[in-house]
Amino acid sequence: MKILVDENMPYADQLFQQLGDVQAIPGRPVPEGVLDHADAFMVRSVTKVNEELLKGRAVKFIGTATAGTDHVDQSWLSQAGIGFSAAPGCNAIAVVEYVFSALMLLAERDNFELKDKVVGIVGVGNVGSRLAERLAVLGIRTLLCDPPRADRGDAGEFWSLEKLVKEADILTFHTPLNKSGPYKTHHLVDVELLSVLPDNRILINASRGEVIDNQALLTALKCGKKLRVVLDVWEPEPDLSLPLLELVDIGTPHIAGYTLEGKARGTTQVFEAYCEFLGQPRKVALSDLLPEPDFSRVTLHGNVTQSTLKRLMHLVYDVRRDDTPLRQVAGQKGQFDYLRKNYLERREWSSLTVCCDNRESAELLAALGFSTELI
């Protein structure tokens, strides 16, 4: 059995070699001829999986080690009798921690307290729901917008996007990309929405680039619209708009979900799904794969303040480490993908144990996702 895996899937060799011969390949572009005799192909979001890629091939299973699936033509796979699995929620914690890292940086730059802001979350799936939970731990008011969940009658109060725009100080987008239908998210942020969005708001997109009309956003910023903007995703990728990058406050190369833990979850989820597909069910413990972090313990005395939180969060991950390299190489052919392919190891807050002399601090940090000990 021949199994192809994206070269940026950690632990793929270690896991999939239990099932057959494994070959790691670039996801964009897919090398000519490699699919000719493959039985399965494990991809990430850079690979467009469709009839053009797979017609006439022997591939019987596609796994994407990502939560998003808009790069996969699932309808065609089903018609062709090809098995498919994604990894929902695998990088949700990573994206939440990316958003916090960005917000802490902006709060320091603009001298505001997050607890005084209202956060509007658009898309309350794996990422949005976890973000809401962690904001609630800090006593920060959140407004939720998720039309599909609202129409299903899910528990909770859901706001329309129109009302959210008027009420929220911070708008953060965590939707899938739907190009049509009743829940279309393509260009959810367009000329019209930007025209009614009050000045001095924070706009964050860590979902899919096309959720925001990048040209409309560029025009608004050029015309003096006063916004703080954080973009991890772009329209298009990898050839993002250089003028837009120059005007946003934080710009990164689609890496919000790129923690080692998140990538490992994605790999293990598609591995387990492929094992099920083969009729050989297996389970993998993430803790058996992950290495000890280089820096794993810190001591905290006293209560947790926003300044303390910023230091702890940025000790694990400071978003500036990804903003600066992108600005240095943007516009150079292949560099967007190079930054993603050669991404420096990044861990999640849970990799850091905070030793506290205060039970209240330990409980708060644990609720946020840090590992804690009382001293």
From Swiss-Prot:
EC nos: 1.1.1.290
An example Gene Ontology CC term for this record: cytosol
Active-site residues, as the UniProt record annotates them: 208, 237, 254
Subcellular location: Cytoplasm
Biological pathway: Cofactor biosynthesis; pyridoxine 5'-phosphate biosynthesis; pyridoxine 5'-phosphate from D-erythrose 4-phosphate: step 2/5
PROSITE patterns xref list: D_2_HYDROXYACID_DH_1, D_2_HYDROXYACID_DH_3
Reaction(s) this enzyme catalyzes, per UniProt: 4-phospho-D-erythronate + NAD(+) = (R)-3-hydroxy-2-oxo-4-phosphooxybutanoate + NADH + H(+)
Example GO molecular function: protein dimerization activity
GO biological process: 'de novo' pyridoxal 5'-phosphate biosynthetic process; pyridoxine biosynthetic process
Subunit: Homodimer.
UniProt-recorded name of the protein: Erythronate-4-phosphate dehydrogenase
Protein species of origin: Photorhabdus laumondii subsp. laumondii (strain DSM 15139 / CIP 105565 / TT01) (Photorhabdus luminescens subsp. laumondii)
